[in-house]
Structures are given as C-alpha cells and as structure tokens.
C-alpha cells in the first residue's frame, strides 16, 4: 500500500511487474538455476585467485573472470522482489528492542537515483511506524567511487552524487535523521570498499 501511494513507489512496482510478465514458474526456475551456476563459478574463481595472490587487484580479477553476475533474476519468490527483504527479515519478528537504525545502502539504486529520496523517506516512515515514531536513523552517505566503465566512456559518473544529495536531503528534512560522510573512504572500481572500520567509527561517534 505504501509503494502504491506515490509515483516513485508505483514506478518501483511497475518495473517488477514488467520483469516477471508472461513467464512461467518453470522459466523462473530455469533462469534462477542458470544464474546460480554462473554466480557460484564466479565466486569460486575469485576465491581461488585471491588465495593464490592475496594482493591481486579487482581490475585484474574483472579482466580475467568478468564482472560479478549480479543481480539475480527477478522472480516472484526472489528475496529481492518488492518488499521481499522486509517481509522475510523484519515483519515476522518486529518490533524487537532497538535503539535506532544504521543504513548503508544505495549502490544499486543508481539507475533510479531520481526517486531514491522519496523511497528512502517512505522506508524511514514505515519502519518508525512499526517501532517508534522518532527512532534515530543514521545514513552512511555513499563513498567516492568511479566504475572503470566510466573511464571507458560508459556509464554516468554523476549518478552517485545525486544519490548522496538525496541522502543528505533526507537528513535535512526528516527529524532525527543523520548522515555520515564517507566521501574519503571509497576505492576506484570497487563498489564495496574494504575499509569498514572508518564508517563504523563515524556511525558510533554520531550515535553515542
């Protein structure tokens, strides 16, 4: 209902409905099984390469084995379907005791950065409705990052700044929402920086 109440939410649902339209359960299973095989093989290759050379770079790994085959196919039973993570991980056990929320997410929302602010605000409101109306919500602002493809004239390097702005705007316009800056913590062509200690310490400083 919350997603259907806004244009951004309806767009999110429409993309999902288009992705699954006209497919049978057999097709969903075949797509998922084929993806899982590719994903497992890729992970095995990466693990073996890192064991052989702990200092191997992602640039080298991507050249040898290609980019990670992510995301998985969209299916009605996927954990990444609309509201899937909420239904599977939160709704069944909420509300449990907590002091606030730590949110480090947004990397894969790059294609839909224009609606991210609205969807993030809806998420904060929905979660607070379950737990407490004014629970602190701490956002890790996306770090510096440039995909190698951008240097090869593909992609748009200005989409992540739009996401950062949306995260910042949420903190400025919603009570008890805060942003932790990590613009100095990113890594070239590595969407998940190795350094997690720095963001963790900054979150702790803000929370405590």
What is each residue range found by the language model?
Residues 1-208:
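Cell-envelope and extracellular/periplasmic
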